[in-house]
Amino acid sequence: MGGGIAGLTCALSLHAAGFRPRVSEAARTIEAVGVGINLLPHAVRELAELGLADELAAIALPPSRLGYHDRAGGPIWAEPLGLAAGYRWPQFSVHRGRLHMMLLAAVRERLGPDAVRTGLMFRGFERTSGGIRAHFRDRASGAPAVEDADVLVGSDGIDSVVRARLHPDEGAARWNGVHMWRGVARHPHILDGRSIVVAGGTPGAKFVAYPIEDPATPGGEALLNWVLEVRHGPSVEPPNPSHRRVPAAEARAGLAEWDLPWLDPMSLVERSSTILEYPMLDRDPLPRWSFGRVTLLGDAAHPMFPMGMNGGSQSIVDARVLAWCLAREPDPVAALDRYDALRRGTVNAIVLANRNLGPEEIIARAAEHAGPLSADRAEEIATRYKRLAQATVAQVNTHASWTVPHPAPDPRRREAPGPAPTSTGGELTTPPSGTTA
């Protein structure tokens, strides 16, 4: 499977459930790259169930509130987050690269130093009498390799090769005409020092900022994540490449009309050592993820526009549900079908809701009315979205974790050494000892 956040969480979850997963990644090295990410309480809860609560708390910051503002910085509506909102688990803002490295270290510690292999290109798969045979190419040597496994789980991102094999007629990712510039920089506190702020007006004009670590000293500078969105018009095909490093001048050009009294966006952009430009992409919801012993997970299954802080969190839940299904259902095909049934409807609904701004509909409605919405109306929009994502306080606090109470009952899954993996874009759960490949 891909060695990103979803794939590594899946490996940890499968290992905890008694399986022998192996991870492969197309990139030659896995590095701490990227910008900020938010993990909602239901995702934090699942990482805590994997024994990662202390490690996560050490690298992340629990935000106190989410505030929506107009383009002049005026307040529209705000709500508490995490523990302050009544959840039993916090919400965390964290640098994606640090989260990635935390998960990678946990996988290597628990599954062994060779559990993650890099530089391997997934080429395709075939079904065998005992499972799946996946085909790969080593990027360094060009040599082909094969791997026999119980199941193949593609978590190789929005341009998933596994997804393309399962849905060969799908075509390119969908672009909505919005460009995003993203970066991180040290900056003085904004508002209470723990706020996520989303400022905007019409769709495609938005500035987001939030801290992703505590400052070294009270009142000092913190590391802030920022995102600028500008709509340049519709397009059938997304830009190529899908993301690139750009000079600060490109982002500054989109900030000419922004005036936020509690934040200087220009300064934040100028302080950023690296600025990345992305087109805002998603894909149409799929009617099916699982095909026999092959399935999809994370962005490979449901890439979505970044509204509502849901993408990474839903991928983590995917991983946990998949491991739970494989542990509870002895037939791998039935297990993947059950996973599909449990997850696909929820995340497909989120993908479609995010195309209509998700909870950020609050900003659009305020712009239409030339002023703040009523608190009741804003609360209604936010709650509707949370309910759809199964992320209200009541839904999260009362739903059992996806932890497997007892590891997989077949001892062969835990004790047999299993062959070395050579996959990318897919997770290989190796067959029990004695299985005929």
Where are these regions (language model features)?
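Short, solvent-exposed loop/turn segments at secondary-structure boundaries
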Residues: 34-36, 91, 238-242, 307-311, ...
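Conserved N-terminal helical subregion
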Residues: 15, 40-167, 171-184, 235-249, ...
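Conserved mid-domain beta->alpha element of the FAD-binding
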Residues: 3-28, 153-154, 181, 209, ...
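Accessory recognition modules or surfaces
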Residues: 31-42
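Conserved protein kinase catalytic core
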Residues: 31-32, 125, 162-163, 304-306
